[in-house]
Amino acid sequence: MLDGVGPTLLAYSDLFLVQCPKCRSCARIFTPNKAKGKDNPRYLGHESKRLLCVKCGYTKDIHPKQRWDNHWAFSHELYDVKQGVDWYFGLPLYLQTQCCGHKLWFFNYEHLFDIENYIKERVRPSGLYYLSAESRLPKWMKLSKYRGDVLKAITKLKCH
């Protein structure tokens, strides 16, 4: 990470908290340890993923395939990040709520805490800011008139 620049959205993609498709409780999508080995090149966002629900035991794996040009890719397009779903299975994110007439969502608690810290700041970073996940936040989230409402919604999600 560059000094003074928050992580990119892709940096949070090692863990998604989603609604389990079977029981609707909190399930995790993560990169299994064996997918991080040196024999299988790991490209951030294009590694094998596992869906696991500890409440009901539901599991499902998804693996990228090596293409003709030696790049790793999934057989499907990754989901649009604006939809409030994970990129791999298309499941609704667990950490989401309505706020100020918009959907507020986070991939995981690290993502939530980083955005919370950004929203709390009165003076926001400049410089290489455009590389960060914070720079991609919708305008309404950055407006001071919504700061209190956004922070209340985040507090509610932290207890989720």
Model feature map: region roles:
Residues 6-9, 39-42, 98-101, 123, ...:
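Residues at structural and domain junctions
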Residues 134-160:
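C-terminal, charged low-complexity interaction regions
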